[in-house]
C-alpha cells in the first residue's frame, strides 16, 4: 500500500533533497521560495534489511507563482490583481519525483492522497484555505500522470530563451538585464490545474 508521510525533521528533509537531486529528470534542485509542504512517498512492501520502510519518492506543494501565467488566470477567471488578493489559496505542486523501478501507475494514487492531505496541512501550517493546485510540466514530459488524475491542462508558459533551461528568478536585477532575451518559445512548460 502506498502512503505519504509529511516532512518535518531534518533527516526527512535530507531524504527529500537526496531523492530530488538523484532522480528528478529535468530540475534536480530542492531549492524553493516561499511556503512549502513536502511528503515522502512510501510503499509498505519496500523495506530495507531491517524491515524499515524506505521512501520511493517525494512530492511537494508550495507557494504559487507570481506573476501568474495568463492561461491560469483565464481558467480561474481572475485578473492579475484579483489573483494577488487570493494568492495563498493557490499552491504549486513544485516537485514530484519517484525513484526508478518503483510501483507502476502509482502516480494517481499519490496525487489523490496529496489532495486528501493538502487542504488540512496547508491550513494547519499557514492558516489559509487551499482551493487550487497547479503544476508545470517540462523536460519533454506530457503530464500523463496529471491527466490520469483528471487535472486540466490549461495552457503553457511562454518559455525561456534558448540558452536557459530553468527559471531566471534566482538572478539579480543586473544579471537579468544582461541575460534577458525575449522568449522565443523554447523550453515551454505545460500548465496543469486542479480545483479542490
Write out the residue ranges for each language-model feature.
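Short amphipathic alpha-helix that is part of the acyltransferase structural core
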Residues: 1-35, 40-42
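Alpha-helix termini
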Residues: 29, 46-50, 119-127
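A short catalytic or substrate-binding loop motif that flags glycine-/basic-rich loops and adjacent residues
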Residues: 29-35, 52, 172-174
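Conserved beta-hairpin
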Residues: 34-59, 66-69, 107
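Short, well-ordered beta-strand micro-motif
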Residues: 40-42, 179-183
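Acyl-donor binding region in acyl/amide transferases
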Residues: 58-179
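Flexible, glycine-/basic-rich loop-and-beta segments that form/coincide
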Residues: 187-196
Amino acid at each position: 500500500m502506498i502512503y505519504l508521510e509529511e516532512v518535518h525533521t531534518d533527516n526527512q528533509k535530507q531524504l527529500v533533497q537526496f531523492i530530488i537531486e538523484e532522480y528528478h529528470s529535468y530540475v534536480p534542485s530542492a531549492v524553493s521560495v516561499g511556503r512549502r509542504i513536502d511528503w515522502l512517498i512510501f510503499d509498505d512492501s519496500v523495506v530495507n534489511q531491517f524491515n524499515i520502510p524506505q521512501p520511493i519518492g517525494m512530492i511537494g506543494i508550495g507557494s504559487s507563482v507570481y506573476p501568474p501565467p495568463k492561461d491560469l488566470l483565464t481558467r480561474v477567471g481572475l485578473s492579475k490583481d484579483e489573483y494577488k488578493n487570493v494568492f495563498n489559496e493557490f499552491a504549486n505542486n513544485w516537485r514530484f519525483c519517484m525513484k526508478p523501478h518503483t510501483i507502476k501507475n502509482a502516480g494517481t494514487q499519490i496525487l489523490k492522497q496529496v489532495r486528501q492531505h493538502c487542504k488540512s496541512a496547508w491550513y494547519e501550517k499557514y492558516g489559509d484555505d487551499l482551493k487550487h493546485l497547479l503544476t508545470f510540466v517540462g523536460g519533454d514530459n506530457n503530464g500523463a500522470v496529471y491527466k490520469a488524475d483528471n487535472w486540466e491542462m490549461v495552457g503553457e508558459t511562454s518559455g525561456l530563451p534558448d540558452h536557459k533551461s530553468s527559471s531566471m528568478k534566482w538572478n539579480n536585477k543586473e544579471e537579468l538585464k544582461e541575460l534577458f532575451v525575449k522568449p522565443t518559445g523554447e523550453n515551454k512548460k505545460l500548465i496543469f490545474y486542479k480545483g479542490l
